[in-house]
């Protein structure tokens, strides 16, 4: 539901029926079409079209060109507001809508992308070697998929008449190579740089003084980096994900429930913090090689109270063991729920049954929310037509990060000023940037998600 917020000022004043732009669509001009015929087709005024396409005031319509068409939403006469009221619609606060309103004549920018393609180490003449690269998710496949997402975002932005000069560099996952790339004039003349992917490489590159003024986007990892001037940490840092989940646990877990904390030796700090918050909780230490004895877990879960289990680990064997054992403990008399303050990629392993996570109502914070659709979306269909496959999470991440940062740079090259805008949502990610004390920007946005049967739902906090 689209929300309309009305700010009441000094004097009451009736608003008569009018329209606001709630969204936009792209129209491809057909043969013999005029501005008037297009306006009649969409039941809008010619002035509405000119508002979003100012270049048409000075030039004629061209066949097969794309123009923006406003989708108008009526504001009813019965609404009374005060004079000079401010009306704000969710869609009007989106960056693409803001860009359309602030559009400058020159909607071009230079984008440099630094990714570890490692093209010099791949024997492309060997079919077996190339095929083996794509068998599992690895740095090479992540790089290619993320790059595909970047290309898709650039293609998408063409509909807004945005031109991107793309320069791609293979870092070869080498610090020496990064030094060579940093001296390239194309990089030094960039409006924005995406990459490198690897935290160590990114920190080295972001410390190069000559590139300090150019925004550099760290796109994928939650591993902490120094968010110095020019650095854009697009992934919400791990500590913020944890803190948000801790707040959720404090507000939603009953201290009288049977709370069990399972934490490995690498998570002593969060283990201690949770134990302080829930002093009556039961603590379980994993056995050698990250396993929990089934008889121990069985003895600590009860039928008389809800069982709330918090697991803190990034060891796959432990996570897999806990999920499987907890699921087997669920009965009509025994209720078991699972939580974590940080969900790593280990939970994505196919050997962890998603139905088990659903049975446990597994709850956590995340930087992204997977699309839950029974049918192919417009986004997926267009990607399929362009690239011949369905987009995975790395593709979508590449798309989301790229579209957001390019729109920000086009709106205002001083990215600090774009922190005033509302949270921006895309396909699976959202962005709400804040200023770090070291001078850079970090994304503070996240989802609280819960598994339900085979789906994942977002928990909207009131």
Regions found by a protein language model. Give the residues of each.
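Extracellular/periplasmic periplasmic-binding protein-like sensory domains
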Residues: 323-397
């Amino acid at each position: 539901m689209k929300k309309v917020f009305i700010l009441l000022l000094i004097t009451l004043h009736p608003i008569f029926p009018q329209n606001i732009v709630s969204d936009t669509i792209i129209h491809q001009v057909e043969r013999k079409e005029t501005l008037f015929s297009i306006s009649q087709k969409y039941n809008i005024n010619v002035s509405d079209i000119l508002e979003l396409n100012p270049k048409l005031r000075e030039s004629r319509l061209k066949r097969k060109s794309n123009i923006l068409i406003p989708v108008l939403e009526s504001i009813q006469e019965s609404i009374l507001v005060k004079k000079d009221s401010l009306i704000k619609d969710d869609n009007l606060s989106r960056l693409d809508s803001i860009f359309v309103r602030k559009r400058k004549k020159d909607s071009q920018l230079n984008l440099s992308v630094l990714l570890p393609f490692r093209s010099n180490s791949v024997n492309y003449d060997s079919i077996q070697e190339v095929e083996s690269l794509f068998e599992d998710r690895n740095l090479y496949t992540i790089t290619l998929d993320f790059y595909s997402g970047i290309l898709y975002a650039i293609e998408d932005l063409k509909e807004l008449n945005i031109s991107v000069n793309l320069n791609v560099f293979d870092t070869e996952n080498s610090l020496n190579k990064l030094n060579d790339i940093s001296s390239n004039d194309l990089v030094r003349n960039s409006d924005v740089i995406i990459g490198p992917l690897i935290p160590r490489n990114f920190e080295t590159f972001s410390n190069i003084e000559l590139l300090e003024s150019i925004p550099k986007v760290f796109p994928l990892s939650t591993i902490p980096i120094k968010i110095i001037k020019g650095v854009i940490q697009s992934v919400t840092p791990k500590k913020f994900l944890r803190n948000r989940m801790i707040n959720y646990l404090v507000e939603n877990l009953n201290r009288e429930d049977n709370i069990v904390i399972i934490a490995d030796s690498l998570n002593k700090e969060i283990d201690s913090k949770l134990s302080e918050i829930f002093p009556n909780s039961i603590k379980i230490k994993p056995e050698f090689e990250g396993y929990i004895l089934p008889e121990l877990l069985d003895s600590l879960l009860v039928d008389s109270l809800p069982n709330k289990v918090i697991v803190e680990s990034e060891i796959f064997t432990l996570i897999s063991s806990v999920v499987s054992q907890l699921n087997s403990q669920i009965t009509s008399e025994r209720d078991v729920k699972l939580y974590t303050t940080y969900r790593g990629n280990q939970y994505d392993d196919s050997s962890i049954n998603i139905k088990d996570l659903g049975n446990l109502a597994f709850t956590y914070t995340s930087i992204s929310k997977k699309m839950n659709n029974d049918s192919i979306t417009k986004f997926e269909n267009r990607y399929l037509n362009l690239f011949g496959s369905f987009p995975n999470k790395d593709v979508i991440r590449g798309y989301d990060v790229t579209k957001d940062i390019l729109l920000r740079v086009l709106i205002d090259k001083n990215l600090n000023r774009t922190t005033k805008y509302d949270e921006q949502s895309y396909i699976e990610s959202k962005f709400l940037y804040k200023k770090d004390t070291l001078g850079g920007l970090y994304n503070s946005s996240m989802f609280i998600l819960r598994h339900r049967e085979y789906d994942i739902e977002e928990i909207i906090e009131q």
